């Protein structure tokens, strides 16, 4: 998946891809971030699964010392992995901003290039009218999260002249992912 997002190490001749460097194909610019984000998410899922099974066992009366030890292990894993996932996600976002600014603009519903860009919590992106209807925004927060500066500039979708992903699916998929993570 990371190669499809940030393809490197190939040449294109008459519509056919030819690998020039397998090293670059595999270890492309987004590979370490996507791998770490997905691997950590898998471990975090396992931690919650462990806690869920332990809770189920405790509710069924099988609450010996082993059940609570496993529950504590799952809770400790989650306590370490959840903040780590936020940090890895931030690094992944910075990498995506560098290599796929149109995707970031679609994820955030940013139409015009702006500094101090607001974070859109909710809204309905409209590609025809180039706006996000009923948007609930937090001023400056998108710039702070994505550039680590209140006055950071985010390129808007209008900069990409149609060369961007469909906005609504990307906008909503990102919110679903964050919602599940929260």
Name each region found by the language model.
Residues 1-182:
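Polytopic transmembrane helical bundles with strong interfacial aromatic enrichment
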């Amino acid at each position: 998946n990371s190669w499809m997002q940030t393809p490197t190490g190939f040449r294109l001749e008459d519509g056919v891809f030819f690998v020039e460097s397998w090293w670059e194909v595999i270890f492309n610019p987004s590979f370490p971030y996507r791998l770490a984000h997905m691997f950590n998410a898998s471990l975090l899922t396992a931690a919650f699964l462990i806690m869920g099974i332990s809770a189920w066992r405790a509710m069924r009366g099988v609450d010996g010392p082993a059940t609570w030890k496993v529950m504590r292990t799952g809770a400790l894993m989650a306590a370490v992995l959840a903040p780590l996932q936020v940090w890895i996600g931030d690094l992944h976002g910075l990498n995506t901003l560098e290599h796929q600014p149109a995707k970031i603009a679609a994820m955030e519903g940013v139409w015009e290039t702006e500094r101090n860009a607001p974070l859109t919590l909710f809204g309905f992106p409209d590609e025809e009218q180039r706006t996000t209807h009923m948007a609930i925004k937090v001023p400056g927060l998108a710039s702070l999260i994505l550039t680590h500066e209140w006055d950071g500039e985010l390129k808007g979708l209008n900069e990409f002249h149609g060369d961007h992903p469909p906005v609504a699916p990307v906008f909503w998929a990102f919110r679903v992912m964050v919602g599940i993570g929260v």
